[in-house]
């Protein structure tokens, strides 16, 4: 049986963590990005399919390629973030299943149903994006996930000729708490959950 993490860890991961819009000028190293992936890859996915593919955009050139795809409200926060992760999904993720799920012919589940393959890739890459956020927080980083962007432009700018399709963007860095908005409410258990 697993032990519960400490109250401090819960605060870091959930209750005190915030979505950041402004950033300190502290770089995020490539080694740290590797640490993030080394943690997030262990989060569960359907049949261990692991469809997420991530481009960590950290150069001025990379940010300029992103610029035309960003909504006006997401522009400045993204251009000033040390890193913007483009979380994409691989439409042919099932080609890796003989390695990732050797217990049966899982590849055929998806090659026989393009709709199931797309739904599985999108849903599971979304879960993996959440694992990325938790991994960042566990390593002392802050994040700002965004869905306000032109997916087609990102796909054209970064993934032309590949099997990848963008899902969402996540800014990563060390947040400037002076630029935080007031904490917004969340739904209560009674409003969001049911017991059967």
Curated annotation (Swiss-Prot):
Keyword terms, alphabetized: Flavoprotein, FMN, NADP, Oxidoreductase
Name of the protein: Probable malonic semialdehyde reductase RutE
Family designation: Belongs to the nitroreductase family. HadB/RutE subfamily.
InterPro entries: Nitroreductase, Nitroreductase-like, Nitroreductase_HadB/RutE, RutE-like
EC number(s) given by UniProt: 1.1.1.298
HAMAP family: Oxidoreductase_RutE_HadB
Other information: The Rut pathway degrades exogenous pyrimidines as the sole nitrogen source at room temperature but not at 37 degrees Celsius, a restriction that is apparently a consequence of an inadequate ability to remove toxic malonic semialdehyde at the higher temperature (RutE/YdfG function).
Gene: rutE
UniProt-listed CDD domains: RutE-like (cd02148)
Induction: Up-regulated by the nitrogen regulatory protein C (NtrC also called GlnG) and repressed by RutR.
Presence of the UniProt keyword Oxidoreductase in the record: yes
SS bond list: none
Any one GO molecular function term: FMN binding
Function text: May reduce toxic product malonic semialdehyde to 3-hydroxypropionic acid, which is excreted. RutE is apparently supplemented by YdfG. Required in vivo, but not in vitro in pyrimidine nitrogen degradation.
Named cofactor requirement(s): FMN
Catalytic activity entry: 3-hydroxypropanoate + NADP(+) = 3-oxopropanoate + NADPH + H(+)
């Amino acid at each position: 049986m697993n032990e519960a993490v400490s109250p401090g860890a819960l605060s870091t991961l959930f209750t005190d963590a915030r979505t950041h819009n402004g950033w300190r000028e502290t770089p995020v190293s490539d080694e740290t990005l590797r640490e993030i992936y080394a943690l997030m890859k262990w989060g569960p996915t359907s049949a261990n399919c692991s469809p997420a593919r991530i481009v960590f955009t950290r150069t001025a050139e990379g940010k300029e390629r992103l610029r035309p795809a960003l909504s006006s409200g997401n522009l400045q926060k993204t251009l000033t973030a040390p890193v913007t992760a483009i979380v994409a999904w691989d439409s042919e993720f099932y080609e890796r299943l003989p390695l990732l799920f050797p217990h049966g012919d899982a590849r055929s589940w998806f090659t026989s149903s393009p709709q199931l393959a797309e739904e599985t890739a999108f849903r599971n890459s979304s879960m993996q994006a959440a694992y990325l956020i938790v991994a960042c927080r566990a390593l002392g980083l802050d994040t700002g996930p965004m869905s306000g962007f032109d997916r087609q432009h990102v796909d054209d700018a970064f993934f032309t000729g590949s099997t990848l399709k963008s899902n969402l963007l996540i800014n990563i860095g060390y947040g400037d708490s002076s630029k935080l908005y007031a904490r917004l409410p969340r739904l209560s258990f009674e409003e969001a959950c049911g017991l059967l």
